[in-house]
């Protein structure tokens, strides 16, 4: 095998040593306390947490009507901005105080604030509650990813990250569909107490099955100020800047596309129930996240990310060219989502690798960049005059992301 193709020469592939005499199915130990039960609990909880973000997309119209004004800022932007900012807080905090207690605090606050959203009498009140929701919700995903990256046996980590990535993506469809059905049959306010109850159950499950690895069960040797300083140094590395430029676009484009497609289909006379089915069309390809790890073993995580961004750009271009054809629009959205399904676990893994051993900080930066982009998605969609214009704009953004992830690989080689 030539040097340029040796896996150990690539900075974007992590190689975990297999513990001697132990298999991937061994019982949990103080070093690797996570088992399949902990993974399953975190995957389901991730679905519920991210549902709070994506459920805003189909509820903009009913909440705007019910509270007499545009709900875009109160429902979407307030949540997304605090969700993004919260990542920068929770990641270093979990590096210092431990994953389990950080997740417990975040999920407890999220459960209460979610239920309280049902009582919001006005858009400003809803915006304040959604901001609290976003800040508390951001304490789950980066901490859970960091936990799985250190508390699972090394040979099981890629599969767990793939499952979490699938959950993040499925939430994009599940949240929209669940919110649409609740709004249609019960009213938009009922969505919040329903989710509050489910989150309370999830919190109990996480407390029951999640146990910190021995090395992260308490305050770390580094001060909390030191953890934040390391996060700042990480963010300024040239390779990470290129990685972040690509990552910024990932959910920005996803949210913008699904926000825009709803209005586009409504303008063509589609019934809400039909739009729900169209939103569901791309659900099966989201499970491609589960095979991203296998592709990365053969190629690398950076090449898997490039493949994902390339496929998603082609799918989005197809949506632009076939915007007036329902079949073409659905086909393009499926191709686009397939690319996203490959890119998400690849990007998460790349952030985990460049940030080791401070993976909480790495996942914090990953989430912050990702959801800053998400907060811009609805604004981008509502500012475009037509869906075709929106899709063409999003295609160009994805092309820039593809170039950035290509630049990341070159810069990562220099950083070594």
Regions from the language model: what does each represent?
Residues 154-155, 162-208:
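Helix-loop-helix hairpin linking two adjacent transmembrane segments in secondary transporters
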Residues 87-98, 288-301, 385:
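Helix-to-loop junctions at the C-terminal end of transmembrane segments
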Residues 129-169:
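Cytoplasmic helix-loop-helix junction between adjacent transmembrane helices
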Residues 85-121:
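Conserved MFS/SLC helix-loop-helix module at the cytosolic interface between two early adjacent transmembrane helices
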Residues 26-32, 211-244:
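Juxtamembrane intracellular "pre-TM" segments in multi-pass secondary transporters
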């Amino acid at each position: 095998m030539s040097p340029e193709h040796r896996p150990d020469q690539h900075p974007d592939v992590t190689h975990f040593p297999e513990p001697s005499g132990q298999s991937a199915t061994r019982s949990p130990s103080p070093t690797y306390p996570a088992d399949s039960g902990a993974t399953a609990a975190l995957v389901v909880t991730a679905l519920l947490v991210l549902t709070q973000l994506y459920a805003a997309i189909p509820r903009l119209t009913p909440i705007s009507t019910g509270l007499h004004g545009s709900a875009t800022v109160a429902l979407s932007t307030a949540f997304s901005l605090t969700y993004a900012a919260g990542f920068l807080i929770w990641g270093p905090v979990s590096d210092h105080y431990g994953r389990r207690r950080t997740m417990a605090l975040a999920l407890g606050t999220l459960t209460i604030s979610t239920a309280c959203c049902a009582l919001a009498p006005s858009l400003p009140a809803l915006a304040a509650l959604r901001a609290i929701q976003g800040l508390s919700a951001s304490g789950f995903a980066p901490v859970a990813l960091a936990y799985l990256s250190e508390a699972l046996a090394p040979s099981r980590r890629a599969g767990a990250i793939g499952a979490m990535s699938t959950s993040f993506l499925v939430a994009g469809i599940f949240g929209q569909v669940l919110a649409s059905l609740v709004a249609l049959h019960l009213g938009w306010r009922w969505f919040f107490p329903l989710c509050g109850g489910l989150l309370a159950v999830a919190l109990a499950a996480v407390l029951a099955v999640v146990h910190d690895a021995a090395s992260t069960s308490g305050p770390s040797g580094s001060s909390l100020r030191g953890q934040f300083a390391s996060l700042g140094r990480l963010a300024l590395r040239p390779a990470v800047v290129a990685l972040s430029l690509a990552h910024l676009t990932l959910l920005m484009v996803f949210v913008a596309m699904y926000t825009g497609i709803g209005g586009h289909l409504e303008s063509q006379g589609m019934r809400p129930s039909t739009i729900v089915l169209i939103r569901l069309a791309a659900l099966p390809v989201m499970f491609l996240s589960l095979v991203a790890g296998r592709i990365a073993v053969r190629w690398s995580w950076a090449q898997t990310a490039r493949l994902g961004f390339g496929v998603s750009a082609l799918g989005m271009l197809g949506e632009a060219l076939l915007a007036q054809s329902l079949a073409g629009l659905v086909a393009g959205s499926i191709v686009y989502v397939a690319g996203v399904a490959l890119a998400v676990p690849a990007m998460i893994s790349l952030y985990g690798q460049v940030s080791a051993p401070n993976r909480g900080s790495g996942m914090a930066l990953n989430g912050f960049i990702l959801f800053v982009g998400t907060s811009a998605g609805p604004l981008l969609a509502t500012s475009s005059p037509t869906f075709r214009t929106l899709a063409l704009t999003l295609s160009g953004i994805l092309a820039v992301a593809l170039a950035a992830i290509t630049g990341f690989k070159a810069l990562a080689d220099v950083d070594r």
